[in-house]
C-alpha cells in the first residue's frame, strides 16, 4: 500500500516548481464486532480489560455528527462506484469517517481557498474546537455495561529538517489529541510509524511503510472498534442459500436469527428496506436492501443514500435509544417501526483498495481542487518553511479496507493514506432476506458512519469471497 502511494508522490515531482512532498498516512481504521463473552484480539488483551481504564463516553455534539454523516453520504456514491481490486467482485468497503478525520487534520494547515474548499466538503466551517474534541471523547469513551470498544488516536511525524508551525501544532494537539514526533525520515522512522500503528490497533494491523524522497510529514490516524452483537447469530442456524448477485447466482452460507424487536424501515414505494442489527453499546450495522432493479439508483445517488441510511429510526424506540444522524431530514414517505424481524444475512468478506488518482478525481468532482494543485494549494499554516521556500500540496490519497461479517459480528479494518506533494406500518413479523445485492453501514452510538459498503456478488461469482 505504502509503495503505491509513494510512487504517486514521486510522479508529482515532475512539476517544474519545487514542491515538498508530505506523505501522510492519515487513517488506519480497525473495526472488530463480535458477540458475547470475552473476545481476545489478535494483539492480545481483552476489550473488557481495556474498557476498565477508560473514562465514560460523552456524546459527540450534533454539529460534528451532522458534518461527518453528511460527508459520508455525499462521498459514498463516488467510492461505491470505484474499482477497488476486490477480486473483480464489485464489492466495496469504504470508510468515510476515516477520510473525514484525515482531511480534517490536513485542513487545519490550509489557508485561503484551499481551506474553504476542504471546509465545504467536510462540512466543518462552523465547527468549534469542542466539536472535534467531542468526536474523540465519544469514540474513546466507555459505554456503561457494554463489552464493545472503540478508540481513536492521531499522530504527526515530521522530518527533522522541517518543523511544524507552532499554531498548527497547538491546534492538532488540542483538537485531535495528536502526538507529534520529529525525527530523520529514514527506514527507522518508517519502522517506528508501523510500530505506532500496531500499538494503536492492538497489534492487529502493522503495514509496511516505505519512506521515499522528499517526504517531510506523515499524519497517522487510527480508529479501532470492537462492537459486540447485542443478540448474536447462532452458528447452528447458518445454512447454505442462494445469493442472486449481479454476475450470477451462488450458494453461500446464510445466517439466520429472529429479532423480537428491531428497527425496520422502508420507503412508501418499497424501493428499499432497512434493518439495524444492534451492538451492545448502542451502535449498529445497518443493512439496506434495495428492491430488484433499484441497487444502482440508490448506491449512486447521495441524497437517496442519505435518505435510506440517515432516516431517524430511534424515535419509535423511545427516548432512551441513542443517536440519530439525520433527524432533520424529510421523511419522504418513510416508515420506521420497531417490530419482530426474521433476518437472513450472508457471511461475507471484502477487501478494498481505493486508487489514489481516482480518489483525487472524486474529491475534485466534489469541489476540492486547489488542495491537489501544485500551483494553487495553500498549506502555509502547516509547516515553517524557513529557507526551504517550498509549496505543499496533496499529491495522493490512498485507502485500503477489509471487512468480515459472520455469526460473531462485523470485523473490518481500513487504511487511508494521504500523500501531500509538497409511512404505513409494517406487519408484526417481517421477513428480511438478504439474497441479492445490498448496502451496509457500520454506525456508532452517535450515528456516525464508520464504514459504508456495497455487496454485489458472493460465493466466487465475479471473484473470490
Regions of interest found by a model, annotated:
Residues 118-122, 233-242, 296-308:
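Short Gly/aromatic-enriched secondary-structure transition segments
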Residues 89, 130-291, 326-424:
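Non-catalytic, conformational "gating/processing" segments within enzyme and secreted inhibitor domains
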Residues 65-77, 410-429, 463-465:
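Short, positively charged
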Amino acid at each position: 500500500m505504502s509503495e503505491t502511494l509513494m510512487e504517486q508522490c514521486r510522479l508529482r515531482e515532475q512539476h517544474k516548481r519545487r514542491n515538498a512532498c508530505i506523505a501522510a498516512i492519515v487513517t488506519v481504521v480497525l473495526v472488530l464486532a463480535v458477540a458475547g463473552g470475552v473476545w481476545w484480539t489478535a494483539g492480545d488483551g481483552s476489550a473488557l480489560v481495556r474498557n476498565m481504564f477508560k473514562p465514560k463516553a460523552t456524546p459527540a455534539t450534533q454539529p460534528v455528527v451532522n458534518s461527518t454523516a453528511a460527508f459520508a453520504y455525499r462521498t459514498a456514491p463516488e467510492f461505491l462506484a470505484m474499482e477497488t481490486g476486490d477480486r473483480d467482485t464489485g464489492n466495496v468497503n469504504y470508510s468515510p469517517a476515516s477520510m473525514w478525520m484525515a482531511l480534517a487534520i490536513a485542513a487545519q494547515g490550509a489557508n485561503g481557498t484551499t481551506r474553504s474548499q476542504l471546509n465545504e466538503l467536510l462540512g466543518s466551517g462552523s465547527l468549534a474546537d469542542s466539536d472535534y474534541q467531542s468526536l474523540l471523547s465519544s469514540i474513546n469513551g466507555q459505554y456503561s455495561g457494554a463489552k464493545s470498544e472503540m478508540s481513536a488516536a492521531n499522530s504527526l511525524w515530521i522530518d527533522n529538517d522541517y518543523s511544524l508551525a507552532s499554531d498548527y501544532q497547538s491546534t492538532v494537539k488540542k483538537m485531535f489529541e495528536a502526538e507529534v514526533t520529529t525525527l530523520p525520515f529514514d527506514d527507522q522512522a518508517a519502522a517506528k510509524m508501523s510500530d505506532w500503528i500496531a500499538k494503536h490497533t492492538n497489534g492487529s494491523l502493522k503495514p509496511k511503510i516505505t519512506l521515499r524522497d522528499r517526504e517531510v510529514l506523515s499524519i497517522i490516524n487510527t480508529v479501532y472498534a470492537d462492537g459486540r452483537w447485542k443478540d448474536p447469530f447462532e452458528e447452528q442456524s447458518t445454512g447454505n442459500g442462494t445469493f442472486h448477485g449481479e454476475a450470477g447466482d451462488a450458494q453461500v452460507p446464510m445466517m439466520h436469527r429472529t429479532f423480537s424487536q428491531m428497527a425496520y424501515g422502508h420507503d412508501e414505494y418499497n424501493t428499499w428496506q432497512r434493518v439495524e442489527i444492534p451492538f451492545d453499546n448502542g451502535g449498529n450495522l445497518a443493512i439496506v436492501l434495495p428492491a430488484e432493479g433499484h441497487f444502482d439508483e440508490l448506491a449512486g445517488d447521495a441524497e437517496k443514500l442519505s435518505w435510506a441510511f440517515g432516516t431517524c429510526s430511534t424515535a419509535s424506540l423511545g427516548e432512551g435509544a441513542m443517536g440519530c444522524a439525520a433527524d432533520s431530514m424529510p421523511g419522504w414517505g418513510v416508515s420506521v417501526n420497531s417490530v419482530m424481524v426474521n433476518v437472513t444475512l450472508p457471511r461475507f468478506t471484502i477487501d478494498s483498495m481505493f486508487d489514489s488518482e481516482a480518489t483525487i478525481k472524486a474529491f475534485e468532482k466534489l469541489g476540492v481542487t486547489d488542495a491537489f494543485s501544485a500551483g494553487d494549494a495553500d498549506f502555509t499554516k502547516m509547516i515553517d518553511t524557513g529557507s526551504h521556500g517550498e509549496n505543499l500540496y496533496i499529491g495522493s490519497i490512498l485507502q485500503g479496507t477489509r471487512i468480515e461479517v459472520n455469526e460473531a459480528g462485523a470485523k473490518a479494518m481500513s487504511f487511508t493514506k494521504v500523500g501531500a506533494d509538497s409511512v404505513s406500518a409494517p406487519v408484526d413479523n417481517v421477513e428480511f432476506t438478504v439474497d441479492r445485492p445490498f448496502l451496509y453501514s457500520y454506525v456508532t452510538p452517535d450515528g456516525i458512519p464508520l464504514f459504508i459498503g456495497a455487496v454485489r456478488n458472493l460465493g466466487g461469482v465475479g471473484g473470490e469471497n
